[in-house]
UniProtKB/Swiss-Prot annotation:
<dbReference type="Pfam" id="PF10209">
    <property type="entry name" value="DUF2340"/>
</dbReference>
<dbReference type="InterPro" id="IPR018794">
    <property type="entry name" value="UPF0538"/>
</dbReference>
<keyword id="KW-0963">Cytoplasm</keyword>
<feature type="modified residue" description="Phosphoserine">
    <location>
        <position position="78"/>
    </location>
</feature>
<protein>
    <recommendedName>
        <fullName>Altered inheritance rate of mitochondria protein 29</fullName>
    </recommendedName>
</protein>
<comment type="similarity">
    <text>Belongs to the UPF0538 family.</text>
</comment>
<comment type="function">
    <text>May be involved in mitochondrial organization and biogenesis.</text>
</comment>
<keyword id="KW-0597">Phosphoprotein</keyword>
<dbReference type="GO" id="GO:0005737">
    <property type="term" value="C:cytoplasm"/>
</dbReference>
Length: 155
């Protein structure tokens, strides 16, 4: 084996730059990627994601987001089983690069400050602290409160 080959094998290369900004800060607010976790059933952990690309967090409101997601659920065939749920709540599940909750379905913390007001057509999404790569849960609030009282999983 020649010395050049040995040198390459023994050297560790990093494929990232510590000075590079986090992806949550690198994309503009008008060109963000957010994930919506559509929750059909809490006990059975029935969740399906919608990934919204190039979403405008600077101009869109929680009401706009709610309507956009409901429209996708109604028009995409893969969401047919989710159409019988009366969705009425959007809540931040996790912020980009933040720690995730122990519960795989929903974040039980921050009910007051991470729940979005879907009736407010003035407050923009970025004003809720939503940025690129934020995950948001969509669910029925009554089902959530019932599951929060007794978080028993059935599968």
């Amino acid at each position: 084996m020649n010395s050049t080959k040995r040198l390459k094998m023994s050297t560790t290369f990093h494929d990232y730059d510590l000075e590079e900004p986090l992806t949550s800060n690198a994309r503009p607010l008008k060109n963000s990627v957010i994930t919506i976790r559509v929750i059909k059933s809490f006990p059975y952990r029935n969740v399906k994601n919608i990934v919204l690309h190039d979403y405008d967090l600077a101009d869109k409101t929680a009401k706009d987001l709610f309507n956009d997601v409901l429209n996708k659920i109604q028009n995409e065939g893969s969401f047919r089983p989710f159409r019988n749920v009366k969705f009425d709540t959007l809540k931040i599940y996790t912020h980009a690069h933040g720690s995730k909750t122990v519960n795989l379905v929903i974040n039980f913390d921050h009910d007051d400050d991470w729940t979005l007001d879907i009736e407010n057509d003035k407050k923009k999404l970025f004003e809720y602290g939503i940025e690129n790569e934020t995950e948001i849960s969509l669910f029925n609030k009554e089902d959530y409160l019932r599951f929060k009282e007794n978080p028993e999983e059935k599968w």
